[in-house]
Amino acid sequence: MSVNISTAGKGVDPNTVDTYDSGDDWEIGVGNLIIDLDADLEKDRQKFEMNNSTTTTSSSNSKDCGGPASSGAGATAALADGLKFASVQASAPQGNSHKETSKSKVKRSKTSKDANKSLPSAALYGIPEISSTGKRQEVQGRPGEATGMNSALGQSVSSGGSGNPNSNSTSTSTSAATAGAGSCGKSKEEKPGKSQSSRGAKRDKDAGKSRKDKHDLLQGHQNGSGSQAPSGGHLYGFGAKSNGGGASPFHCGGTGSGSVAAAGEVSKSAPDSGLMGNSMLVKKEEEEEESHRRIKKLKTEKVDPLFTVPAPPPPISSSLTPQILPSYFSPSSSNIAAPVEQLLVRTRSVGVNTCEVGVVTEPECLGPCEPGTSVNLEGIVWHETEEGVLVVNVTWRNKTYVGTLLDCTKHDWAPPRFCESPTSDLEMRGGRGRGKRARSAAAAPGSEASFTESRGLQNKNRGGANGKGRRGSLNASGRRTPPNCAAEDIKASPSSTNKRKNKPPMELDLNSSSEDNKPGKRVRTNSRSTPTTPQGKPETTFLDQGCSSPVLIDCPHPNCNKKYKHINGLRYHQAHAHLDPENKLEFEPDSEDKISDCEEGLSNVALECSEPSTSVSAYDQLKAPASPGAGNPPGTPKGKRELMSNGPGSIIGAKAGKNSGKKKGLNNELNNLPVISNMTAALDSCSAADGSLAAEMPKLEAEGLIDKKNLGDKEKGKKATNCKTDKNLSKLKSARPIAPAPAPTPPQLIAIPTATFTTTTTGTIPGLPSLTTTVVQATPKSPPLKPIQPKPTIMGEPITVNPALVSLKDKKKKEKRKLKDKEGKETGSPKMDAKLGKLEDSKGASKDLPGHFLKDHLNKNEGLANGLSESQESRMASIKAEADKVYTFTDNAPSPSIGSASRLECSTLVNGQAPMAPLHVLTQNGAESSAAKTSSPAYSDISDAADDGGSDSRSEGMRSKASSPSDIISSKDSVVKGHSSTTAQSSQLKESHSPYYHSYDPYYSPSYMHPGQVGAPAAGNSGSTQGMKIKKESEEDAEKKDKAEQLDSKKVDHNSASLQPQHQSVITQRHPALAQSLYYGQYAYGLYMDQKSLMATSPAYRQQYEKYYEDQRLAEQKMAQTGRGDCERKSELPLKELGKEETKQKNMPSATISKAPSTPEPNKNHSKLGPSVPNKTEETGKSQLLSNHQQQLQADSFKAKQMENHQLIKEAVEMKSVMDSMKQTGVDPTSRFKQDPDSRTWHHYVYQPKYLDQQKSEELDREKKLKEDSPRKTPNKESGVPSLPVSLTSIKEEPKEAKHPDSQSMEESKLKNDDRKTPVNWKDSRGTRVAVSSPMSQHQSYIQYLHAYPYPQMYDPSHPAYRAVSPVLMHSYPGAYLSPGFHYPVYGKMSGREETEKVNTSPSVNTKTTTESKALDLLQQHANQYRSKSPAPVEKATAEREREAERERDRHSPFGQRHLHTHHHTHVGMGYPLIPGQYDPFQGLTSAALVASQQVAAQASASGMFPGQRRE
């Protein structure tokens, strides 16, 4: 830029030749230009100095900022700047356009320098006071103000700030200078556009200065047009304002339409695609350069009055300068106006010439070639086979493409054969390549590349992620990066080949081409369609001119004036540009043929609910692709096509046009990433979905773009996410079986992901009959997924591993189907089903893409976890609002509202709080898809876990989710929606079926399971991967955990107290359970994240936590000595017992979870629990992680009471450690657990899993009793030799007492705790009782516990924290199998049972005897009574405990939820306000436990009420 500017300035100033010299410098290479930039600047400076009185200023300004820099120099600089501006304009636009090119780089450097220098000269632009600001302002203002303010500023600055005189003084100066200024501003801001301009400028420079000037004007307009329109307006606006009439016409024409014709075309182009538009603009310009030049000249001459009328402009400059300059630099401007004016006249020519040069040739200047454009490619044959495969290196638009061209006569999947043009080979391989790419992307990657050269550019912006866009995946596509090319092409090739071969080659090719093009083209063309049409039209004309076909076929489209040499070009064009229903009709047959099943379902759903349909479409893309493509990406494009073809397609067609710009940007953004064909499909779907509904995009962007309202914002926000998703997908593309997995092709591994969908969908489909139709995405998937529905079993082959879980799953499925059917019907199947279809589609897509996308998202979310709180809280606030709405109409109405708004929020949550949910989405996806997608890095662990326990985890997670359709749906929804709010919505929608808060279960289980159990049930795969993360994080977090637990306790106390009560107020007022579930879903881990975020963001919280942590650490340390042995022993005991239990309860990984290492490596255990929950004994190592977690989940459901009691005890212990940290005596139990916060937590969880396992099955309980009774009764009673029993006993007793002595024993128990904890661990239980009793202390412990896990272990913490949440969800779910057991039992059930069992096993006579008797009575009593009597429940007889365990199971599996919900409501009111809001589910679970066995539930309730609150 500087060079051009300097050159322009030089040339403009004394000689145009100088400008030419500068132009020559530009001509030199990018490197030379970069090097020459300064030299040229110096030269220009010197020349300016020589030429202008303000040469120095001008030079420095010129140097400083392309043209704008002069403003910084001052009035004298203004003159020089005017010159420079003029020259800069030419050069700046060049710089701008070159910026993107290598030239662009040079110019960018110059521009950057100029921009930096321009900062002063920015004043030129609009802020006289701050050059920099001015320039920035220009840039900033450029979009909207640039034309007006910037043009004024530019003028003022040009005249006043050395550039201002140019702008204002001289029309030419203004035009050129403004162009330069605009260029400068654009240069930075619109590097893409600039680079286009730059290219143009470069070539134009070669062409001539006059062209340069014109081009600058044009470029100004080009850039000005579209995103750059303001710049153009700015450039010309300066001229216009400066020169009033002179620039004004230019401004009007240029800014509004691009300089008259040129600008108009440019503006078309520019609007068409910012960069592309400009690129196309350049191309068009080249094509229309002559006409543009003439127009530009006219305009230039119109502007020339600016430029040409040096005399008037100086006056104008003076007048304008006073007008504008007074604002900015009127004096300087006026003074230098005349000289600058004259110089500017020269500059004018220079500027025009510079810009025009690079217009045609710069590929970047020309957007991606429009489909149907005829191109002649020159290439070198790399390889040709006898089979009709030609590999060529083609240079197109200065880009080299490697393409594999297929002989369409020999390859059915080759590009359409209907191409008859002289360039038919290229067309076939290139233009047809689109169709071919769809068909033989893999077969002809190179072909597509060469084709992409011709079409790839088009594809680039067209959302290379389209069937034809898949071409975008061509290497040439660039946006569709080679990875996509490879993955897409390869995948597309099989699918394409299969489909294409299966279908009539011509029809298939045509349809596929059209259809493939359809999604991509529609997105692409729609994004560029309107502009592209004009653009493509000249472009087409230009290209067509190049083509030899004498007769051009006019596009029949009413608004399309494009002409094509062959029908093929027209078809390609139509496929991409006119993918609306008419074109869809054209391609619909193929789409129907390919995806008729999915399409039918999709159309139904899509037609049924445009949003769900879009979601379905997106989902179908994921799903249908597999269906048509047998899980191959081609199938995905077909899904897209289907999507396009289907009602969603129509919707998308219409909306895609609208959103095409948006989507185009998104697609471009996404396409820039190596986007997988599937992702591309998803993106296209998203584009379509974006157009048709945010749903599809949400689907793809899942939570991010879910809301239409937020679609734009989230699209932007999620663009990054999607980019990540794209990257993930590109990564996963290889592993992308997931995407195909959604496809109903069971044969492939994808079938497993399909199974994932199936498990979800199966649950959804079976669970939601109406949803099945509505969730046509599931339905498209459903036809295949119905085959795959068994796949839930496949997915859940591990499910099979756990027959109990399977049975639970079946029970829950049945139950939830009933409930879902009920509620689906109640909710209004169409609306809810549509919503669910959308949600599930989103979920399916989210599940597929999210598996990766969410994985990335998860990583992102992990990052977000810390920074999440702000956005989360804001989103949560919106979610709360949404929850108010939703919860007002709990299950039915909320589904749409939540589905859209909440889902949006969910998507936001996905980004924000839902990160965990996406994690879990990933988890679910990963868990389910890990089998299919085991190869993916993220799922590598999961695959192990999935294979060993990961599959189990998945199956269990799936079981937990897929066991009940409601659960599955909720999982799906949870995955889709977030996994919190989303889960809530989904649950409302899907779980709403369950009269009880099934939706809440999904909230908890999906969200908690997702976040915490990312490594647990659904996290089986993702969980493994994330389990690994969790392992790492849990190890890290475990370390943090101590801090986090303690800090989190405080934080949670505060956050829970503040946030949850707020949320609670919103939600609790609604359905307490729903509120809880929503908040749990949203806040369960969201709170953790909030805590974490608060920790990260809130120094106060950190201080509080650290303080709390220190207090607890002291207690912990003390207790660590006394309690560590106990803890270790406890861990060992659970390990031993659980090891046995593990063997016995392989179904219940909790046995594994409660291994001795849990104490030493609580983090590890946590990780293991989280990730390997599914891994049972198979992957005891892993399984222990996952299995432990899952076992905990399962054991939780079985041992919800024990867990609750245990949790209460643990919380009581923690509270003790918090409270007893002051009372060092009673800190022992807490220290035991707290000493190693992780160990302690793990002990609780280990105990939980252990006790879950123990109480998972009565056998385990009995065995544990035998084991524990002998070891515990004797040693653990008071000697606490088996520290485990003692600890457990004490824990049990503590929660009992905590529950029991809610108020009475509080002080006593505290004292007792102090006394007992140290002396007798199990006696400490009573002491813990006190600690637990103290609501705040308990709450703190609860929060701490909850928070500690969630905080460091957003994933892993899911065991306790998520258990806390999920149990309600899962409990309410008939299949609390994983989540309920996992979640609830950890706190209520496990605690209660553990207490009972521990008390019984290690018959601490005091507690056990009394409480045992009480246990039966008290356990039978309700929550309030439970609290006071929780010790009794803790101590209930072993038989009672076993009975309770059975009840617990029954209760957990079928209708613990019912009572749970009732109780949940009760507890919600009570426990929810506190952290229990998060653990309220435990209370709910406790309620569930109460339902099954109120005794256990009583314990759980008591512990669940307050301990539940404190429980973490």
Curated annotation (Swiss-Prot):
InterPro entries: ZN608/ZN609 (IPR040010), Znf_C2H2_type (IPR013087). There is a cross-link at K283, K880, K1118, K1176, K1182, K1199, K1216, K1234, K1250, K1292, K1310, K1414 (Glycyl lysine isopeptide (Lys-Gly) (interchain with G-Cter in SUMO2)). Residues 201-218, 713-729, 818-858, 1030-1054, 1125-1145, 1231-1241, 1253-1276, 1291-1327, 1437-1453 have a biased composition (Basic and acidic residues). Residues 1-23, 46-74, 89-237, 260-295, 417-545, 622-665, 713-750, 777-858, 925-996, 1011-1066, 1117-1192, 1220-1335, 1423-1459 are annotated as: Disordered. The modification Phosphoserine is found at S421, S424, S493, S627, S782, S895, S964, S1098. Residues 220-230, 449-458, 526-535, 925-934, 979-989, 1055-1066, 1146-1157 have a biased composition (Polar residues). A zinc finger (C2H2-type) spans 553-578. GO terms for molecular function: zinc ion binding. Disulfide bonds: none annotated. GO terms for biological process: negative regulation of transcription by RNA polymerase II; regulation of transcription by RNA polymerase II. The keyword Lyase does not apply. Keywords: Coiled coil, Isopeptide bond, Metal-binding, Phosphoprotein, Repressor, Transcription, Transcription regulation, Ubl conjugation, Zinc, Zinc-finger. Residues 781-790 have a biased composition (Pro residues). Residues 278-304 form a coiled coil. One of its GO terms (cellular component) is nucleus. The keyword Coiled coil applies. The modification Phosphothreonine is found at T481. Residues 51-74, 151-185, 260-270, 960-973, 1183-1192 have a biased composition (Low complexity). Transcription factor, which represses ZNF609 transcription. This is Zinc finger protein 608. It comes from Homo sapiens (Human). The gene is ZNF608.
